[in-house]
Amino acid sequence: MFRRILIPFLLLASLVGAAAPAQAKDQHSLRILLTNDDGYSSSSTQSLRQALIAAGHQVTIVAPLTDASAVGTGLNIKFGSTLEAVERSPGIWSIAGSPGDAVAFGVRVLFASNPPDLVISGPNAGENVAALINHSGTVGAAVTALAGGVPAVAFSTARGPSNSFPSTQQSIDFAVKVVNKLAATSAYNGKILPDHTALNVNYPVTPNGQVKFAKLGTSLPVSTDYAPAPDVCATCYRILPLPATGPDPVTDADRTLLDAGNVTITALDGSWEAGPAVTTLVKVRLTNLTP
């Protein structure tokens, strides 16, 4: 049997400002909320859960009911509406919403009395690098966790030829290594990561044996193009992929290093604020404006 819960979204909105995460009793055994944007039944997420449990961690899946890719940091704030949450089997929950909704529900309801030590999102089927993370539900779920004071790691596996993912199992094994390393080296007042910090980890198609700490690129590995689709309707357009044609302009960008076969790790803080130099330049140009 599974359990259904209908939760008003007013409760989920209180995620921001949630309590800081508590440590598990065993410092090397973490209480983990595992999510994704591919749906709770994703085989790679189920495999990661089993691998983490085998490593001694406590893992609860709280993930979207169906595929919710490319929804970014979307969160349902239609206050007064409802969300359906179903416990499909012990420790595995489906949420009729976005990855962000799943994390918000998990932190505020399932872990209400004791927040998880870590939120893990993924492993996603497809890389999440450079400007692509702005649209990623996988990374969006990790950013939602930061808003509630819970550290997070997003894992993604690069796409190979013919839409294949030959390094999926390797990426799962590496994810467990990362989690175990974080659990064994906590140094931030007992927290897994510094406040307001998430990690974005991407695993290459053909690993070269190197792990690189990368900067966040600014390019889009793939964007969208549109072509008339009169076979569907007179005003319809078909959405097509538009691959990037040039290198990322950022030195040591995650996209560049991943394409070279490196595992990439990038620290994120969830902020879209421009740096001080850009802010100063814009301020000078817009000086003396009045309402």
Question: Where are the language model's segments positioned?
Answer:
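Bacterial N-terminal signal peptides that target proteins for export
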Residues: 1-9
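Bacterial N-terminal signal peptides
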Residues: 8-17
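Sec/Tat signal peptide C-region and signal peptidase I cleavage site
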Residues: 20-24
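A cross-family phosphate/adenosyl-ligand binding-site feature
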Residues: 28, 50-107
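Structural recognition of the beta-strand scaffold that forms the well-ordered cores
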Residues: 31-35, 59-63, 94, 117-122, ...
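Solvent-exposed loop/turn segments at secondary-structure junctions
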Residues: 38-41, 65-69, 99-101, 124-129, ...
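Internal, conserved structured core segments that host functional sites
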Residues: 113-160
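Electrostatically charged, flexible surface regions
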Residues: 170-291
